A protein has these predicted regions:
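Extracellular glycoside hydrolase catalytic/binding regions
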Residues: 72, 86, 93-192
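Structural recognition of the beta-strand scaffold that forms the well-ordered cores
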Residues: 1-2, 7, 35-37, 41, ...
Length: 192
């Protein structure tokens, strides 16, 4: 279930939607289903795509205040749903973009407000690993231990080998999105 960072309605001008997440959880429990809550957007964007909430902008990771805010949102989601029967788990961040995807994906669009895009870049691996450790600790502290904490590979699958085990993380899952529509761009870039 994709949710935005303003899910609780505390970021103007956006209205929240937490009542719909509550409803989805109620329905899931009523009908024996499980919900994976996926934090799909962050303030300032994590991938520069529309599904990250703001096209052409990717600079959330450069703003410590917004990074802390996202951890706070995850904590609140974990507190609210971490003991619910209908929760499968929480995915901490949808599709943080890698350097290669940021530069070469064919559908990358320009920001409507070019000024807002200033400072945008890919999400560095070092930052992502640090953020994932913090998100894990934040969620694990407030959720039942059998609930999954899910991490997107950031389009860098091979870079996660042993990371979760070496970090001592339990009951985690790595989410991988394979988009064949970008394959030609990558092949052409690597094999001109």
């Amino acid at each position: 279930l994709p949710v935005p960072y303003f899910v609780f309605g505390d970021r103007k001008p956006y209205s929240g939607c937490i009542e719909y997440v509550d409803q989805a959880m109620d329905y899931a429990e009523k009908y024996g289903l499980k919900v994976l809550i996926d934090l799909h957007t962050v303030p300032g964007g994590q991938n520069s795509y529309d599904n990250g909430g703001i096209t052409g902008v990717c600079k959330w990771h450069r703003n410590p205040k917004e990074v802390a805010y996202v951890l706070y949102v995850l904590e609140r989601l974990g507190e609210r749903y971490g003991h619910r029967k209908g929760l499968l788990g929480i995915e901490v961040l949808n599709e943080p973009i890698s350097f290669r995807v940021y530069l070469f994906a064919p559908s990358r669009k320009q920001a409507l407000d070019q000024g807002e895009a200033i400072g945008s870049s890919h999400v560095p691996m070092r930052f992502l690993k640090t953020f994932y450790k913090e998100a894990y600790e934040t969620l694990r502290a407030v959720m039942d231990p059998e609930k999954l904490i899910v991490f997107h590979d950031g389009f860098r699958l091979s870079r996660w080998k042993d990371f979760f085990v070496k970090s001592g993380m339990k009951n985690v899952m790595l989410d991988v999105h394979v988009y064949l529509w970008v394959l030609d761009s990558f092949l052409h870039f690597h094999n001109p």
